[in-house]
Amino acid sequence: MTKLQKALFIFLNSLIILFVLILLSISIPKFEIARVIANLYTPDGQFESFTLIYAKLRYWLIFIGLMLLLTGTLALIFHKRSTSFFLHTLSKIQDAFKQLWLDAAVFLKALKNQFDLKSGLMVLGITLIGFGIRIVLSGKPIQYDEAYTFLSFASRPLNKALSDYHLPNNHLLHTLFVHLSTRLLGEGVLAIRLPALLAGGLLIPAAYLLGSKLYNKFTGYLSAMLVAVTPILVDYSINARGYTLVALFTLLTWCLGIYVTRHANSFAWVLIGLVGACGFYTVPVFLYPFGILFTWLLLNLLFKQFSQSYSSQINFFMKMFVAGTLTVILTAIAYLPVILSSGTASLFGNVFVQSLSWSDFIQTVPHRLNDTWQEWTGNVSLIFIIPILVGLAISIILHRRISSLKIPFQLASVLFLIPVLLIQRPNPWAKVWLAFLPIILVWAAAGLVGLLDQMKLSRKSIKVITAGICLVLLIAGLRHTVTLHRQYAQPGTVEQIVLDLAGELQAGDVVISMDPVDIPLQYYWRVNQLDPAILNSDNELIDRAFVVVHLPFEQTLEGVLTDQGIAIDNPQFLQEAELVEDYGSSLLYVINAD
């Protein structure tokens, strides 16, 4: 052992002991003393939220501190053995990083080879079409959930935005991206929707990758075009929520999973862990696609369906275990601010994730499946639905003939989802399953291309027919885009109400509304820089009240006022309300206080 190595070892142990002493200095004294000490370690002398953190972590810090102190002390006492162990471990880590670097180069080269000039241009063209459709429609009026995401989370300082989980509406990684995009580009709807839009557009080349890896390039092209123009995928891409991110991470992890069964590449395994953590940090429902992936990997392990470049089944299992562990550790670290601020109950015990009773679960599932079907097939003609269903069925029936995999992902999906859903008994909202739609479209594309192949058509004929199908899909997608663009070209109802009120408001006015109008109204109020106090119905000095009544939710003037805590003692009061404007879906009334 060189002097430099010995000095490094002693230095690291000294740092451990110093860190331990700081922990113990905060944890062991009484609260007031601990708070004063903690303030010494902050730049401004004020440790925010120290009371909450101290109460939750004190005994854990004491335990961790004592264990580290014991470890560091023993390492210094038995320095020869511990130094030898340290150097051996350091050498292993260095070797692992060298191999990781080499594997990264191999992986990137393999990724580059997925796109020759011709296929690269094809995928780029389809991707640009998909992005174009999404950008054209990005002016859609802001919806309740995305307005709530921005106002309640993304517009706040990051330390608040990424620790507040009072509703699972906070898709944390998406919130982080929206926070950054709105800081850079302003608070317009396009800036708010940019992360979802980018993820939705990147689904297109990701679908090509999965289709080409599972089947062939023709399947990849058709998959990409289906993802580019499918209405519900376009709609989620212009909805500032985290679901397109989850879908993107799903496709990426599945592509990586296929790759690692064919190549013993440590870098790809690490990417599975990193991308997996990103998926969980976006929305915890990423458990479903990620669980299916690891079920499929486990099946490949059991039936030895992996590359001979792995030295053994144990070698494959250890890499799989490391990737899974990396995902768990990174996810736990990412959610630590939430746990410290809101506790684990906000993640696992909120009303939206609690298990249903068996009777409620059995009654709910058929309705949710119908909701999912209606959402996925809305604005889609039967002319397209039937071929997709036929293609999906063929991909399952002809799996062994058309797929490059011996173990189908469909089997892993059944083996994982059925027991998990029966144990968990969730309320399976349609949006939970969006990540699977691009995969289903890949399977459908594979079935259609596989059918052409089974008909013994030439490669040129398959190419022409596939191109023809893509052209038909493109025309249908563009027609649908033109129709929607005409609707979105004008301000939506809520935005128009705000614009109309902006020139009418005066001192003593108040604007009253309720769900689902109130949150979008607050957003447009904010971007138009109007006085937020006017939206406060608790204001005692009210001269005039504007009331928004949303007809699709069967709201009434009296119902809106009552919901906002305004008692109606005199029926004559409602009769004196004057209808200012009929917006079709909403009515705007004005009531004078006198």
Show which residues each predicted segment covers.
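N-terminal hydrophobic targeting signals that begin at the initiator methionine
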Residues: 1-2
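An acidic-aromatic substrate-binding cleft motif
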Residues: 116
